Swiss-Prot record:
Up-regulation conditions: By phosphate starvation, via the PhoP/PhoR two-component regulatory system.
Keywords: Stress response
Gene responsible for this protein: yhbH
Family: Belongs to the UPF0229 family.
Name by which UniProt lists this protein: Stress response UPF0229 protein YhbH
Length: 392
């Protein structure tokens, strides 16, 4: 604090924008983290440490180091000449290295003589991944059903009153009311504030009906489904389950495992226990129809069946599968089939499903880990966006 010639005191004359430097750097860092998540999302979705975590673990991803701009000493010790006419723009080259660079950063088994880029590992939580992934997903073709007796309640501050709770005082309107009253008496000031100046924000309860929905998660657990195939299927269902429970309050999930026979299992068994035996996929479709008839009336529920298999089905069972899938689609909003086929081998089930022409039928073939992310985007995208059947 200093006193000038006029007798007034100055608190500070410095450029306060410089104090934002730390905040700006933090914002740049967060932006880089979000870019890294977006660029690595297909791989992060199938990261084993996340799939097998308790929801609280973190994963590390590489992010390019953010160095401050500054003049550096030229360790190559080459001569440079830089000149300009005073009209240089941001990004113009000031000087170029005159040396003939035939070497570069080391890569693979070759050794280089140039410095590489600095990277560091940033920790990313499961919540960060969910935020990046789920904003692109939604239940397609969600319809308003009969007898929707579950409502979602929200609160909206949309009214101002002269009485209310102390914690809901609208400071801006209160001070403006006091200023106007004081100005009318010839003393324009925010103070004093009298009880009649107080303004309180009040809210109204907003209710809206939400349509019920059920997702039938069906997974092939037969002997032909190896460790990698089951891991891919469970990775998809892991993210599907978290997505549904995060964005929809009224969605139920039924877990069905099958080999030659199908049975409804607990969520824990679905994600942990393996089985063996042959494959008869029609068994899981019959079980789905039984559940729909017993518990999920199509007039009250949006129905979304998801089936994951390796496609190695009993050949004589394929015709029954096609018939049952058509029966399910008459009651469901959508039918999604995911096939884990890493080596592009012949699939008896996929050969039969290629003849299904119903718009409700969608499939995706997963050949590598990043395809889990693509399958999620393909299945959980609104029909209005023009989704079609896709291969990886």
């Amino acid at each position: 604090m200093s006193q000038n010639d006029s007798g007034h005191f100055l608190i500070s004359e410095e450029n306060w924008s410089l104090h934002r430097k730390g905040f700006d750097d933090q914002q740049r860092h967060q932006k880089k983290v979000q870019e890294a998540i977006k660029n690595n999302l297909p791989d992060l979705v199938t990261e084993e440490s996340i799939i097998m975590s308790n929801g609280k673990d973190v994963v590390k991803i590489p992010i390019r180091s953010l160095d401050e701009y500054k003049i550096r000493y030229n360790y190559d010790k080459n001569k440079h000449v830089g000149q300009g006419d005073g009209e240089s723009q941001v990004g113009d080259v000031v000087a170029r290295d005159g040396s003939d660079k035939k070497q570069g950063p080391g890569k693979g088994q070759g050794a280089g003589d140039q410095a590489g880029e600095d990277y560091y590992e940033a920790e990313v939580s499961l919540m960060d991944l969910e935020e990046a992934l789920f904003k692109e997903l939604e239940l397609p073709n969600l319809q308003q059903k009969e007898r929707d007796n579950i409502i979602h309640t929200d609160i909206e501050f949309n009214d101002i009153r002269k009485t209310g709770l102390t914690g809901n005082i609208d400071k801006k309107r209160t001070m403006m009311s006091a200023f106007k009253r004081n100005a009318m008496s010839g003393k324009p000031s925010f103070y004093p504030i009298y009880p009649e100046d107080l303004k309180y924000k009040t809210w109204n309860d907003i209710t809206k009906p939400e349509s019920k929905a059920v997702v039938l998660a069906m997974m092939d657990t037969s002997g032909s489904m190896g460790v990698w195939e089951k891991y891919m299927a469970r990775s998809f269902f892991f993210w599907m389950t978290r997505f549904l429970r995060t964005k929809y309050e009224t969605v139920e999930i039924e877990f069905i495992a099958h080999h030659t026979e199908a049975r409804v299992v607990s969520e824990e068994d679905f994600f942990s226990k393996g089985e063996s035996g042959g494959t008869i996929c029609s068994s899981v479709y019959r079980k789905s129809l039984e559940l729909i008839d017993e518990k999920y009336n199509p007039a009250r529920y949006n129905i979304y069946p998801f089936h994951f298999s390796d496609g190695d089905n009993l050949t004589s069972d394929n015709a029954r599968c096609v018939k049952l899938v058509n029966d399910i689609m008459k009651k469901a909003n959508l039918f999604c089939y995911g096939e884990v086929n890493q080596y592009n081998r012949h699939s008896t089930l996929m050969s039969a499903y290629k003849n299904v022409k119903d718009e409700k039928f969608k499939y995706y073939i997963l050949k590598q880990k990043s395809d889990v992310f693509q399958a999620l985007k393909n299945f959980f995208r609104n029909e209005e966006s023009g989704v079609s059947h896709q291969f990886s």
